[in-house]
Amino acid sequence: MISTTRGALCAGVALIAALVAPGVSRADVIGDWNILAQNEALLIRPTAHGQTRGMAMVQGAVYDAVNAITRKHEPYLLDVDDVGAQPFASQDAAVATAAHHVLVAIVAPARVPALDTAYAATLAAIPDGASEDGGVAAGEAAAKAMLDARAGDGYMATFTPTIGPDAGNWRPLGWPATTGLDPDGWVGNLKPFVIQSTSQFRSKGPNALTSAAYTKDFNEVKSLGAANSTTRTADQTTAAIFWQFAPAPLWNRLARDLAAPGRFNLDTDKQARLYAMVNLAAADAAISCWNDKYHWGFWRPRAAIREADGDGNPATIADPGWESLFNPSTQTTPPLATPPFPDHPSGHGCLSGAVLRTFREFLGRDKVPFDVYSGRFPNQPRHFERFSLALKEIVGARIWGGIHFRTADVQGATMGKKVGFWLQKHYFQPVRP
């Protein structure tokens, strides 16, 4: 994945140099920098949530920089009166400066020269003068506000998970060995971007082991999620693997596609708001989700099915050799595995619920035809007619992969939708004339 990402980054730099037209405010510049940010975020840390945090920081700053010029909506962090940007200030310069300045502060030093080159290419296409200077000043102020706000936010803080030997307790593969623990356990204690607390949207929690609901979930994933399942369809297998990909590139690609000419044709101001809302919602959904995961500490289907003899439920039949579809023998790149963190709630359910709710609220409708692209199947997008139908498939996909109980998926999606709705109601409100 990393070699592909580096190639995409170089392509993104070339794209900016080739496509920016002098003296013209173009929505493509913000899309180009979204691509660069996405590809750089993948290199910040090769796990989902270093990427999620990085994208939220970049796109939140870009929004504030553009909004300091247009003043159409409430700012996220930046006091627009302190900036004093004029309406004629270059939005392109503001976008590039905000994105560049945040990125160079959070990426590895070796990545800075490529970002500097891209930044210079963007500015070279903008005529020198008060417009460019005003845009740069807005971008600098927005980046500083974001970096100041996120200083000491708990990124990469030491985290020790609770691991239990009892039925229902989560433990890593190979227990009692504790190798391969969650590299992103710190996420659940990260300072939120928009919600009031990490536990604001606490889920109802997993079903009791002796309940009929748990039995139903157990038997469903045992059948549909097994590596050698005879009940899972070929399309369900494809969908399960398709969705096992980092959320940041999935949803930012869709945001750019929806913003494009011929779709919703969003200008720079609207794109800035959409990208900020999508990535801030995803970040806080991840924070809420990981806090909830370690609050409940519930075992995944693999452990539950193998050790069902000890769960106190006579209706759940153990299979000591049961393996999920998500295991290294499944032919795909990169290899699949049971994730090294608790089942409940589903991370993809949380993030996808938040993002898809954000798209729906931003566009004012659920019925929007679109394609989603995954690095697992680069040339085989999955098509949906509604945002809600994509979320429905994601809920199913985690069961078909054998890594989640349905309750974890459903409650995760619900949590994510609550985060997205909260953001839409409390942030980015129009400024009254």
PLM feature spans:
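Bacterial N-terminal signal peptides that target proteins for export
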Residues: 1-12
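Bacterial N-terminal signal peptides
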Residues: 10-20
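Acidic/polar surface patches and capping/hinge elements
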Residues: 27-433
